C-alpha cells in the first residue's frame, strides 16, 4: 500500500467524527459515534472534534458540543444543503487534510459508507468498515477496531500501524447515546468552503418518502421469525406497549 497523504509523525492527537445531518437533524448514529469518540479521546487525553458540513447547521454544532465534542468544524454552504458525494467529499477531504487527525470515525449509513470509501482512497489509508466496537491501544496510541465476519462467528481486531487517518465506520445502534450536558462549552470553528456549482455532478430531482419506519431510530424492536407463522398481531401489540416497532427475520 502506498504511503498515506500524511503519516503518524504529522498527525494531530485528536479523534474526529463526521456528523451527518438530514434536514436539520443530526443522525442518531453520528451522536452514538460522538459518544464513543469522547470515551476514546478521554483515554488518550486527546481532543474530540466534530466535522459538520451542511447549510444553516450552526444550531446542530451546539447540540454536538452538549454530547461531548470539544470543537465543531462547521462547513456551511448552500451547495451542502443536500448530501452529494462530490460536495461533501471535497469539503471533508480538505478539512481533514487541514487538521490531520489521528482518528476519523463515521457512521455506517448509506451516505457515511459512500463518503468513507471515497475518502480512504484519497487519503491512501485503510478503512475498517461496519465496526461493532472500538477501543484504544494506549501503549502505541492506536485505534483497535472490532469487525465481525461470517455471521458473527469471527471477530477481527484491526490496528492501523502507519497510515493516517485511522478510519472506521460504525454500525448504527452498537454504542450507547450519551445524555446531553447543556452546561458543556466548546469551540465552533467556521471553515471556509470553496465549492463551485460545476463541481456537483449529482442533482436531487425529487425525494419520495417510503413510509417505512427507519429501524435504526426505533428505541425498541420486537422481531418475529418463521415460528410465528405470519401472525404478527401479538407482536404489534407488544411493540405498542413497549413504545417500539415490529421487524421480521
Regions found by a protein language model. Give the residues of each.
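N-terminal glycine-rich FAD/FM-binding segment characteristic of electron-transfer flavoproteins
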Residues: 1-249
